[in-house]
Amino acid sequence: MDVPAFRERLLRLAPKDPLVLAVSGGGDSVALALLVKEAGRQAVVAHLDHGLRPESPLDQAFVRALAERLGFPFFTERVEVARIAQARGENLEAVAREVRYAFLHRVAREVGARAILTAHTLDDQAETVLLQLLQGTARATGIREREGIVVRPLLAHTREELRAYLRARGEAWREDPTNQDPALDRNFLRLFVFPLLEERFPAAKRALARFAEARAEEEGVLERQAEARLLPDPRFFVPAFRAAPLLEAPLAVRRRALRRLLEKLGLRPEARLVLLLEEALRGRPQTLPGGVLARRKGGTLFLLPPRPRLPLPPGFRRPAPGDYLERPSGRKRLVDFLAEKGVPRELKPLWPVRAEGSRVVEVLGLYPPPPEEAHMAEALAEAASAFREGEVPVGAVLVLPGRVLRAHNRVEGLRDPTAHAEMLLLREAGPEARGGRLYVTLEPCLMCHHALAQAGVEVVYGAENLKEGALTRFGLPTRARGGVRERECAKLLRDFFARLREGCRSG
């Protein structure tokens, strides 16, 4: 082991003391503690007894003695992991990992540590990559060198290198007998698969580690693109995302975005579950583990828990048979109104309403129309003007303190390819545009997206722009919100292009 090189790597990964060292008593973590001491860093030793083995008190005593010898403060807890896993009906290894990291983060908060060090090695990296490939998680990026405040400074070193380091110093370590149990997938790979691989391919572990490193770099780029495609639809009280940015994404980006969705739900990002979400995006509802229903309605992908819980503010109740709204256009049944607003059927019986008898006077978040609906109605009126003038029917309003500006596309009328509704409003507002909010019937194109971002204008749009949308077509990150009066915005565009096609046929 090259201690100076380790010192430099540790300084790069975790420049500030104190450090929290996760030490089980095994050879890897004992080597980590000794290396940190040799590097001259300040640290505390954290040891969690999982309550899984009769000899675990001996492990704790060994680690305590090691910490005292090194002059590091010692923190320990005992948690009955098997009991927790059984009560939850969850995988023992997954629960053990969750409990262990929760303990390490508590210790870090208590001592004010900026980094938690674990002793994962190149062997762990190779095993993890192969396990991920075999389990169908698809990413196969292995273990990250840094993840939040968790740092893994030994990923470049093999288990044998660390054992040689310990033997050269006459240091002892504890052996965990459960590491010899082939019933566990990781142990099976370590005990049987890798020995066979290394007979034929001696550099197999390093090759897998290099593969993981390259994949992690690629994944970082694709992850940022995938995250941009996850555009929440905040109108609903359950996880909901705009469907078009996902559907229009390149396959690799879409599947990464869907894996992120699975992780947000607390599910493993397995390939089969990603395929289920793709089916849901195409309009075929799918049930995920845990009873979560993935269903697309209109332009929104819903992830409905088995028992959705919607808030019931004081004075509100659940919908009842016969409920209706009295609107200027006439009476409308509540169930029809909720369907018009894109509320999935699973949420209709739960949506909070305030009523006088059967006459509904308020539908939470939907009626009376929120201000954004009124502003989008103004944008729709502008789009209708564009329609009548033979322009692509896109309208927009820019809401500023004390005034509202309105515009619609005038590309043909002005013979100016930049005369989009958004650009006309920015020109009119000038420096006052900063901090304003733009309501536009169609998702902005690349030109308008960049101009609005530079001007510091928040964007709310109606329909997705499948052909030129900055997010939907090109995947640019955005803080815009979409889907407001989506049906009306999309219908106006459909009607315009249908008339255009009819005119071409007539001509």
Swiss-Prot record:
Reaction equation(s) it catalyzes: cytidine(34) in tRNA(Ile2) + L-lysine + ATP = lysidine(34) in tRNA(Ile2) + AMP + diphosphate + H(+)
The keyword Nucleus is assigned to this record: no
Ligase found in the keyword field: yes
Domain CMP/dCMP-type deaminase per the UniProt entry, residue ranges: 370-500
Short name of any one Pfam family annotated for the protein: ATP_bind_3
Enzyme Commission code: 6.3.4.19
Alphabetically ordered keywords of this record: ATP-binding, Cytoplasm, Ligase, Metal-binding, Nucleotide-binding, tRNA processing, Zinc
Binding site for ATP: S24, G25, G26, G27, D28, S29
GO cellular component: cytoplasm
PANTHER family, per database record: TRNA(ILE)-LYSIDINE SYNTHASE-RELATED
Domain statement: The N-terminal region contains the highly conserved SGGXDS motif, predicted to be a P-loop motif involved in ATP binding.
Cited HAMAP family: tRNA_Ile_lys_synt
Assigned protein family: Belongs to the tRNA(Ile)-lysidine synthase family.
Name of this chain's protein: tRNA(Ile)-lysidine synthase
